[in-house]
Amino acid sequence: MLTMKDIVREGNPVLREVAKPVPVPLSDEDKQTAKRMLEFLINSQNPEIAEKYSLRPGVGLAAPQIGLSKQMIAVHTTDENEKEYSLVLFNPKIISESVEMTHLEGGEGCLSVDREVQGIVPRHARITVKAINENNEEVRLKLKGFPAIVFQHEIDHLNGIMFYDRIEGWVDPYKREINPSL
């Protein structure tokens, strides 16, 4: 079972890497890892389990957040109509996005970020994601609202992007300036 000790925190270089594609057909090891990621999210939303194991509630988790530079995400959330999204995806790509933008009123948070970050994170209101599911099948998901925001946040992790990188005027304290004169 994954716990908060397994979640890498900001400043860890793996969070800034572009994750590697997962070979298909999927290995049993990759399927198990993804299953454990989803299990973490489900457990984190259960008040008794979350309290017992000191889990912070989460709706999405990307493999880089557990130290693996692989294109794998898990999501466990619902939309405004209570439709549940509880799944793992491999090699997810956003293949279309709306011009219309949206954001979460209170800003975004992240299991890998132990502090509150103020600011609005602009996201596309609607997206289509293409990916491989745990049965090695290609799937396409049309998403809007909160699930669209969650999937964009997790797919950003696969590209080395933290949510606060998208806040206008944000300066990353962990980003190193490269001195061209050296």
UniProtKB/Swiss-Prot annotation:
<dbReference type="InterPro" id="IPR036821">
    <property type="entry name" value="Peptide_deformylase_sf"/>
</dbReference>
<dbReference type="InterPro" id="IPR023635">
    <property type="entry name" value="Peptide_deformylase"/>
</dbReference>
<keyword id="KW-0408">Iron</keyword>
<feature type="active site">
    <location>
        <position position="154"/>
    </location>
</feature>
<dbReference type="Pfam" id="PF01327">
    <property type="entry name" value="Pep_deformylase"/>
</dbReference>
<protein>
    <recommendedName>
        <fullName>Peptide deformylase</fullName>
        <ecNumber>3.5.1.88</ecNumber>
    </recommendedName>
</protein>
<keyword id="KW-0479">Metal-binding</keyword>
<dbReference type="GO" id="GO:0046872">
    <property type="term" value="F:metal ion binding"/>
</dbReference>
<dbReference type="GO" id="GO:0006412">
    <property type="term" value="P:translation"/>
</dbReference>
<keyword id="KW-0648">Protein biosynthesis</keyword>
<feature type="binding site">
    <location>
        <position position="110"/>
    </location>
    <ligand>
        <name>Fe cation</name>
    </ligand>
</feature>
<keyword id="KW-0378">Hydrolase</keyword>
<feature type="binding site">
    <location>
        <position position="153"/>
    </location>
    <ligand>
        <name>Fe cation</name>
    </ligand>
</feature>
<dbReference type="GO" id="GO:0042586">
    <property type="term" value="F:peptide deformylase activity"/>
</dbReference>
<dbReference type="GO" id="GO:0043686">
    <property type="term" value="P:co-translational protein modification"/>
</dbReference>
<comment type="similarity">
    <text>Belongs to the polypeptide deformylase family.</text>
</comment>
<feature type="binding site">
    <location>
        <position position="157"/>
    </location>
    <ligand>
        <name>Fe cation</name>
    </ligand>
</feature>
<comment type="function">
    <text>Removes the formyl group from the N-terminal Met of newly synthesized proteins. Requires at least a dipeptide for an efficient rate of reaction. N-terminal L-methionine is a prerequisite for activity but the enzyme has broad specificity at other positions.</text>
</comment>
